[in-house]
Regions:
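Phenylalanine-focused residue identity feature
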Residues: 12, 30, 49, 77, ...
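Soluble extramembrane regions of membrane proteins in the secretory/endomembrane system
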Residues: 1-135
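Alpha-helix initiation/capping motif
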Residues: 35, 100, 143, 209-210, ...
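Cytosol/nucleoplasm-facing, intrinsically disordered, low-complexity tails
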Residues: 286-289
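Hydrophobic alpha-helical transmembrane segments
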Residues: 88-94, 147-152, 177-180, 201-213
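Non-catalytic ligand/cofactor/substrate-binding and regulatory segments of enzyme domains
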Residues: 1-29, 161-166, 189-252, 256-284
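Core alpha-helical transmembrane segments of integral membrane proteins
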Residues: 110-197
Length: 289
């Protein structure tokens, strides 16, 4: 830091005070109050600084997070499932400084004032304390998008077979509900019980919640008794339409793989409605395949 000895001493005292037991813990907020923002606030107290005019294109928290996860598609997909619409808001310079690497880039261009009021660079030099080699990304063809495409193709094939032959692939529907419910359990817990930001504004709670897990045993028992189940015709269809509407209205950025999964739900729901309403016209039904 390009600061005077008096400013350095003041910064040191502030750090000592911050390290006291009554001050050393705080509610961590990875978007707005994290280790980077705390360090920047400490610097700003002793050496107020200015940033150059913002010439960066408009970006969001989600865009920045994606820039760090582009080599890990499953990690990116998982984060997109739990982070809500709060991360889709446009950011100013100060908000972007919550990210360590972006903060480093901006601080190299920041200026402060010396004792005479002259504008000087905030940073005098840079030193790499620990040089950690970057790990090579592990490429895999089984990305969330590829898996979702394969699942959609399987859904189309099985649905067409049902319409042509009257056979019912209940095991496929039950597996789809199980996966939906397990993912929904994570989203549900974060949505209602987590104090972290963004997870409580997740529109995907409409399709990813524990309801499929709760209803799955009921569905199995009804089908064993030869009764029509209403999960896929009603909730499955509505949840899929809800997800597509959220994406269409741009209320939240929904990953493409999730949209394809919603199409699978929608297709199975519509097939269930057709099978339910047109059952006498079909060739008949059979057990799981």
């Amino acid at each position: 830091l390009n600061i005077s000895s008096q400013q350095a001493a003041e910064l040191f005292q502030n750090l000592v005070l911050n390290a006291q037991p009554e001050n050393r813990s705080y509610r961590y907020n990875f978007l707005r109050d994290n280790c980077t923002s705390r360090a920047i606030d400490m610097i700003g107290k002793v050496a107020p600084f200015a940033l150059p005019a913002d010439k960066q294109p408009s970006t969001t928290y989600r865009d920045i997070i994606h820039s760090y996860t582009q080599d890990s598609p499953w990690l990116e997909f998982g984060q997109d499932l739990i982070l809500g619409c709060d991360v889709d808001t446009l950011l100013n310079q100060h908000a972007r400084m919550m990210f360590p690497l972006l903060a480093e880039q901006m601080l190299t261009q920041a200026t402060t004032k010396d004792s005479l009021g002259n504008s000087i660079p905030l940073l005098k030099d840079e030193t790499i304390v620990v040089n950690v080699p970057q790990a090579a990304p592990s490429a895999t063809p089984f990305t969330p998008l590829m898996v979702a495409i394969l699942l959609l193709c399987s859904t189309v094939a099985l649905s067409w077979t049902e319409l042509r032959t009257g056979r019912v692939f209940r095991l496929f529907d039950n597996t789809l509900m199980l996966v939906q419910g397990l993912a929904g359990l994570v989203v549900f817990v974060l949505f209602f019980f987590s104090a972290q930001p963004a997870v409580g504004s997740n529109w995907l709670i409409g399709v990813l919640n524990p309801l499929p897990l709760v209803w799955l045993p009921i569905k199995i028992m009804r089908e064993r008794r030869g009764l029509q189940d209403y999960y896929l015709p009603l909730y499955g269809t509505l949840a899929a339409v809800f997800t597509l509407v959220v994406a269409g209205l741009q209320l939240q950025i929904i990953p493409t793989a999730m949209l394809l999964l919603a199409l699978c739900l929608l297709m199975r729901g519509l097939i269930s409605i057709i099978r339910w309403r047109c059952r006498p016209l079909l060739a008949g039904t059979s057990s799981d395949k």
